[in-house]
C-alpha cells in the first residue's frame, strides 16, 4: 500500500510513453490486463513525472532525464559489479555493455527495437575499446577473483545534476582509462582521458543508433556519404528521427579523428545466443 500510488503512476507513464505499440494490447493475462485498464481509466492517477538525475551506486549505473523527453543512461562495472553476464548460451557478445556504454533515448520508444541482434558489438555508444577480435563469451568478469580491481566507479548527484566517474581497466588488462560524465542543464558532457593501451587500435564510439528515416547533419550540412575529419574542433553533429521537434545533438570538442558514416547491418537473435535465425536488417 505504501508504494501503490507511485507504482500506478509509473505504470501509467510507461504505457503512455510507449509510442511504438499499445502495451495493454499485448498482455495475455486477463487479470493483469484488467488492472492496467483500470489504471489507465482512473483520472485520479497521474503519470509519474520523472526528471533529473539518479546514481545507482550498488549497480554502477547512472540515469539522467533532461525534462525534454531526453534520457541518458550510463552502464559501468567495478570491483563490485560485473562487466557483463553470459549464461545459458545467451548474451555471448555482451563484452562491452558495462564499459561505459551510454544509452541515449529520445521520444521514439522503438529506437532500440532489434538493436542487439544487429548492432556492431565493437562499436557500442560511449565505449572506448580495442578493435581486436573477441571470442564468444570471452572476458566475463563476474565471479569472485575475476572482477575488475578498480573500485573508483560511481558518482554523486543532487537530483538535478550528477558527476559520474569510472576508473577502468579492460578485461585483458591491456587498456586503462578514466571516463567521466557531467550531467547538467540538459547536457551530458562525456570525457575519456588518461587512455593507455597495448591492445592494437583503440577507438571511442560516440553513438551507434538505428536510423530508420533519420538524417545526420555535420555543422548544419546533411551527411551524404562517409566522412573522416582530422583534428576536429567543436564539431556539431545532429540527428533527428521520426518526430519533427526532436533533435539529438553532439558536440565533439576535440579529437584526433572523427568518422561519421551510415551502415546497413544484418544479424539474427541466434547470433547472440537467441533461438530465432531469421535475418534482420537495420540501418545505423
PLM region spans:
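Extended polysaccharide-engagement surfaces of secreted carbohydrate-active enzymes
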Residues: 2-284
Amino acid at each position: 500500500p505504501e508504494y501503490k500510488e507511485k507504482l500506478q503512476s509509473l505504470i501509467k507513464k510507461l504505457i503512455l510513453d510507449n509510442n511504438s505499440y499499445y502495451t495493454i494490447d499485448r498482455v495475455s493475462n486477463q487479470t493483469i490486463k484488467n488492472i492496467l485498464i483500470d489504471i489507465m481509466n482512473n483520472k485520479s492517477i497521474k503519470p509519474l513525472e520523472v526528471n533529473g538525475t539518479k546514481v545507482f551506486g550498488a549497480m554502477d549505473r547512472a540515469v539522467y532525464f533532461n525534462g525534454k523527453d531526453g534520457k541518458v543512461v550510463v552502464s559501468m562495472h567495478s570491483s563490485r559489479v560485473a562487466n557483463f553476464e553470459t549464461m545459458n548460451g545467451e548474451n555471448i557478445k555482451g563484452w562491452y555493455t558495462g564499459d561505459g556504454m551510454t544509452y541515449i533515448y529520445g521520444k521514439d520508444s522503438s529506437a532500440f527495437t532489434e538493436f542487439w541482434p544487429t548492432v556492431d558489438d565493437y562499436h557500442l555508444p560511449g565505449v572506448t575499446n580495442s578493435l581486436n577480435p573477441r571470442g564468444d563469451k570471452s572476458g566475463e568478469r563476474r565471479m569472485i577473483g575475476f572482477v575488475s580491481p578498480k573500485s573508483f566507479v560511481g558518482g554523486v548527484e543532487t537530483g538535478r545534476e550528477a558527476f559520474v566517474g569510472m576508473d577502468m581497466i579492460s578485461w585483458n588488462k591491456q587498456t586503462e582509462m578514466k571516463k567521466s560524465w557531467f550531467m547538467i542543464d540538459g547536457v551530458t558532457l562525456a570525457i575519456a582521458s588518461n587512455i593507455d593501451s597495448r591492445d592494437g587500435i583503440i577507438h571511442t564510439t560516440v553513438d551507434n543508433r538505428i536510423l530508420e528515416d533519420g538524417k545526420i547533419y555535420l555543422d548544419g550540412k546533411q551527411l551524404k556519404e562517409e566522412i573522416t575529419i582530422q583534428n576536429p574542433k567543436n564539431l556539431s553533429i545532429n540527428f533527428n528521427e521520426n518526430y519533427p521537434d526532436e533533435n539529438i545533438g553532439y558536440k565533439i570538442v576535440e579529437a584526433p579523428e572523427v568518422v561519421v558514416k551510415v551502415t546497413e547491418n544484418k544479424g539474427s537473435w541466434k547470433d547472440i545466443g537467441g533461438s530465432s535465425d531469421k535475418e534482420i536488417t537495420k540501418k545505423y
